[in-house]
């Protein structure tokens, strides 16, 4: 859904509860739902605000909000593509298919580990946790690639060992 600038300005002003001209992670969290009727995970919201906070002041202004809004829409489209049963969450099989389509060929054991790390004991991953899982995986992949000069998926340790260790630290 493409929205015009005036509509987005209206959304921005509604989310900007304190009328400061910028949106904090807490303000953004209260305005977004994960598709299961609960607010987005604050860690996901903080991650997204940090990604789009170009002036590094801890909040996003309207121009930064435009990028974040498109980013969330793109992730919603992706999420809906893999939520085949329209349950509002992605089960293990749907999550595995999404990761494969992103080019990740991980063992079933590792996909299970990711599922357990991001499902909040629900057995499925809601929209916000899907974003968080995918952005973490992309960030860690980018970091790993800096050291995997030959692009073979191994350095001093395997990719999955690196991810396992990193997930234990960041989650």
UniProtKB/Swiss-Prot annotation:
Record localization: Cytoplasm
Residues where Ca(2+) 1 binds: 16, 18, 20, 22, 27
Gene Ontology cellular component annotations, sorted alphabetically: cytoplasm
Primary localisation category: cytoplasm
Signal sequence extent: none
Record InterPro entries: EF-hand-dom_pair, EF_Hand_1_Ca_BS, EF_hand_dom, Peflin/Sorcin_CaBP
Gene3D superfamilies: EF-hand
Record keywords, A-Z: Calcium, Cytoplasm, Metal-binding, Repeat
Alphabetical list of SUPFAM superfamilies matching this protein: EF-hand
Keyword Metal-binding among UniProt keywords: yes
Ranges where the EF-hand domain occurs: 3-38, 40-69, 70-105, 106-140
Binding-site positions, Ca(2+) 3: 83, 85, 87, 89, 94
Binding site for Ca(2+) 2: 53, 55, 57, 59, 64
GO MF, one annotated term: calcium ion binding
Function text: Calcium-binding protein.
Descriptive protein name: Sorcin
Species: Schistosoma japonicum
Lineage, opening ranks: Eukaryota, Metazoa, Spiralia, Lophotrochozoa, Platyhelminthes
